[in-house]
């Protein structure tokens, strides 16, 4: 994970998981019992700060105590390997091994192809037959994450016996060996694990952003993980003892028939229900829970819970006794309200599903377990700046730069002193008439202040905004009078439209569109206003720019880091705005398709767009988001396929025209004759092949001894001839070398006073202009195809995150609303124009 404390995973632009909540490790580990891990899940795990295994420090990690299939020599393990792709590139190396005694028991070892992190290994054990036959309530074959992430944890059911019962300091943990961290476990006296034990894999991952991983009485910090990595098993013997102990304890606990997990499947977070177990591992149930209200709570606040139920007839005397409510890792008193109703207040808890039950002593449950959900606090829209000092100062800096550029780049004196063309004067008057509504804004602000309808801070913001609007109107009128020459930049190379886009001032788009200035104006780095709006995640600004005609398929100037440039979708993806990036990528492909259609390179329309316009109905929010994501992927895939087909067709036409240009009738006739010969030979190919095969079989069967002797004799004769020819060549070489030396010295040097053969230089052939132009075209086409592939990948990445689908849905609705507002604004502007003419 990144070190910024936000819990973002490294390499999110490759595997698609930005946070640990997106990765959902607990669900992934449950599903790993019945399926193999996906390449993007493996890449996300191996890229983080959580170290799984260091195969450079412990090279014998494959000697795990299992009996694997061997090669023919009987010593080496027979392993198959391949490379897995994450996206469009190979990034993971995987090795397979099958059991010798049990062929359905399989081991997979994964590590990254990246040289910087290739030493981290993830090992996955699974019995494929058990995963296909066992039910969802049983535990399948063991999954081994035998690495330094959890060095003091062996398995979920053995966690209380692996770690010491007393508090262990970081120094003690760093100095203990693997054998000292493990203690003998009595499998017969082992009790059924609780849900908290089963979820220990995900708790350290969720707490990794805070720098610690806690469980029970042991607290292991990130520094101790690195120390354990350095002080881990350094010999094959210690690692073998640890693996044998781990496998024996894991298998023993899994084969125990009394082990019945109390984990319920994850429910839909949008509609949680009170789900209980049909049976319980408790020897005798005292209290029967019928309802828990509420069924979920936010993880960052205290929550009051009402537990409703009834006591069994034989335990009615315990009605007013002191009971406890156990929720995850916390045990709080349960206050008696009335018969069968208890109230408790649970403290904040990390997000996830936990067990909730009543207990008499705070440990042993006396009721069935209820699955209670702690939800993460909803993240605010990324378009809204964070409420901290840095974001406020950054926004204020942009406002200062915009104000400075508007007030210092005025050319009123030059405009008034120069001769203004009638056309520019007429356009300036039109702009002034269309922007008269700003006077109404001033009047509304004065009335609001006098009537105390707005707060003081809102009044200041409105005043500042109106001042910028009026100054921008005057600035645009000056540029229209000058002939629309917008070459004003601030100290960092940004123009007015770029600063407005960075700040999210959507009102500036209407003024620029009315003035006739280009919305695709580039700054000194080649960025347009749409690039800046996408970079800062300004969804409303992006929608306004697209509605006003901004082009989403423009590319920034090339840099040393990115030779092909970046699109607006690439910039949004870099800052984590997946939904916005997918929407811009789709619009980029559609815009390029329409441009090529106008140019005559493509015919027809996109069928996906037609189907989307026809199939519009009312669906729930989640289904509508998924439907929009699927429609976007269909549109992007179809547009990319049509564009690539046009590229191939154009390249084929160019090759065909070049061939026709240099061809003549004689060559054409030869090609026709050659084609006829090929057709005639193809008709007789089958018969001739059978005859030749039969002849070769007969000859080899009859004369293989004679041929072998003949080949040996011929080989010896060839060697003798080669040796003789080499001897003659060496004799003649000395004579030729002496003759050339005499010729060079006598003739070229002494007589003609010139350089010898050593001074001869061959003139380099210069490339023709046509070849250079062709190379430039190929490079441009290759970069365009790469941009197409990136756009399709951006749209496809939405399916990895539900939040990205919701962001895409919100961006789509915002764009549709902006289009309606822009059309309404244009109609009002043209209506005023027609009324003035009348």
Swiss-Prot record:
SUPFAM superfamilies: Ankyrin repeat (SSF48403), E set domains (SSF81296). It is found in: Nucleus. InterPro entries: Ankyrin_rpt, Ankyrin_rpt-contain_sf, CG-1_dom, Ig-like_fold, Ig_E-set, IPT_dom, IQ_motif_EF-hand-BS. Residues 738-760 are annotated as: Calmodulin-binding. SMART domains: ANK (SM00248), CG-1 (SM01076), IQ (SM00015). Residues 25-134 bind DNA. Expressed in roots, stems, leaves, sepals, petals, stamen filaments, top of carpels, anthers and siliques, but not in stigmas. ANK repeats lie at residues 525-554. Residues 671-700, 713-742, 788-817 form the IQ domain. Residues 802-822 form a coiled coil. Keywords: Activator, ANK repeat, Calcium, Calmodulin-binding, Coiled coil, DNA-binding, Nucleus, Repeat, Stress response, Transcription. Belongs to the CAMTA family. Transcription activator that binds calmodulin in a calcium-dependent manner in vitro. Binds to the DNA consensus sequence 5'-[ACG]CGCG[GTC]-3'. Regulates transcriptional activity in response to calcium signals. This is Calmodulin-binding transcription activator 6.
